[in-house]
Curated annotation (Swiss-Prot):
The gene is hutH. Its EC number is 4.3.1.3. It catalyses: L-histidine = trans-urocanate + NH4(+). Pfam families: Lyase_aromatic. Keywords: Cytoplasm, Histidine metabolism, Lyase. Its main location: cytoplasm. HAMAP family: His_ammonia_lyase. This is Histidine ammonia-lyase. Pathway: Amino-acid degradation; L-histidine degradation into L-glutamate; N-formimidoyl-L-glutamate from L-histidine: step 1/3. Belongs to the PAL/histidase family. The keyword Transport does not apply. Contains an active site 4-methylidene-imidazol-5-one (MIO), which is formed autocatalytically by cyclization and dehydration of residues Ala-Ser-Gly. The modification 2,3-didehydroalanine (Ser) is found at S143.
Amino acid sequence: MTLYLDGETLTIEDIKSFLQQQSKIEIIDDALERVKKSRAVVERIIENEETVYGITTGFGLFSDVRIDPTQYNELQVNLIRSHACGLGEPFSKEVALVMMILRLNTLLKGHSGATLELVRQLQFFINERIIPIIPQQGSLGASGDLAPLSHLALALIGEGKVLYRGEEKDSDDVLRELNRQPLNLQAKEGLALINGTQAMTAQGVISYIEAEDLGYQSEWIAALTHQSLNGIIDAYRHDVHAVRNFQEQINVAARMRDWLEGSTLTTRQSEIRVQDAYTLRCIPQIHGASFQVFNYVKQQLEFEMNAANDNPLIFEEANETFVISGGNFHGQPIAFALDHLKLGVSELANVSERRLERLVNPQLNGDLPAFLSPEPGLQSGAMIMQYAAASLVSENKTLAHPASVDSITSSANQEDHVSMGTTAARHGYQIIENARRVLAIECVIALQAAELKGVEGLSPKTRRKYDEFRSIVPSITHDRQFHKDIEAVAQYLKQSIYQTTACH
C-alpha cells in the first residue's frame, strides 16, 4: 500500500493501515508546488532583508534580535541543538514514525517555507524506517512540542540517535550506510520542523487507535462475564436504548446482543432475579459513553493532523504574500481532547474491575467457587488478580487528573500560558496500558468462570473467543504465577491491533 500525502486529507484510518501494511509515503504534485511557492517567499524575505520572526531574528525572548544574513542557516542549526532537551524514556517506534508523517503532512500545506530537500528527507526517513529516538519528557505543548521535535530534527541533520533495522545507531552512520547526505538546514527550516503539536498528536493517534480497539475488546470480554453470571439479556433490547437517542449506546447494545446470541447461560428478566447490577445491566450506557469520547477525540486529532501549526505562517492572497506570527502551535485543543480520552479509557477499566470482582466474590458470583479456586483454602485462585486490577484502576484515577488545567510560564514570561498536551498524551497512554491489563485480568477470570459454568452453554461467538484465548491461558487447575497469564493476554490483545507494523 502507498499512502499519498497532500497536507489536507490524512485520517487516522490511513495511519492505522500504514502501520499494519508496511506502507510507503508518496507526495502529490500539488502539495509539492505549494511547498515551492512558500519557500520562494522565504527567499524573497532573505533577499530583501526584511525583519521576520525566526527567519531574520532570534527566537522567543530574542525575537527582537536581528541576525546577520551570513548566519541565517547557523541560527536554525543552533535552534535544533539547543532545543533538543528531551528527557526520559523514548516514545515508541510507532509514535516516532507517526510524528514524522504528521510533520511532513503539515509542511505540505505550504505555509511553512520549507525546502523540497527537507520534505524529501522526511519522506526518506519514513520510507526507510529510520526511526528517531525521541525522549518523551520535556514538552510544555505550547510553543509547539519543541524538545521532542528537536530530537526528530537532529536525526535529519545527522546528529541524533535512531533505530534502524532493530539497532540503535547514530543517524550519521545510517545515512552514510544508505549513501544519503544529512539535511543542510536553510533559513526558517529549524523552526518549521519544531513549531507544532506533532508529538502530542502522534501519541494521541496511537492512543486513539488502541483505545478504540480496547472498547471493542471489552465487549466480548464483558459478554463472557455476563454469561458466567447468568446475566439478564433483556437490558440490551433495542427499544430500551432507542428511546435515549445516544447512537454509541445503541451500537454497544446491538453488539452485546450479537455476542450473546445463542447462549443458554443468559437469563430473562425475573427468571432468577429481577435485574442485574449496573456493571452488567449498564454496559451499553457506560461503554457507549466511552465511545462518545473516542469520537470527539478522533475529530480533534484529524483536524490537527491536517493543520498548519507552524509559526510564523506564510500566506499568498490576490498576488500578495504576507507572513503572520500567530499561535497555531498551541496545543490546547489536543490537550483537552487527550484529557477526555483518559476519562473514556479509565471508565472501561473501572467497570471491568467491578465485573471481575463479581466473578470472584462468593457473595456475588452465584454458584461459582470463591475466587474460582480449584481448592478453596489451600489454593487462593484469582484472589490477588482482583487486587492487581484494583491497583491499576486506582493508578488510572490519579493519571486521569487533567493535565490541560495546568500551566506554567516560560521564556521569561513571553510564553506565559502552556497546554501540557504532551503530558496528557503520555499519561493517557499509560492509562491505556493499565486498562488493557485490567481487561486481560477480567478475560483470564471470565475464561475460568465460563469453564466452570460449562462452555457448551456459551454463545457461538463467545465460544470461539474462549477457544482462541484458551490457547494462551490454560485452565486453572492449581495456583500458579498468574502474572504470566495476564501479561500474555494483554500482549495478545495489543498485537491484534498491529498484526504487522511498519516499524518492525
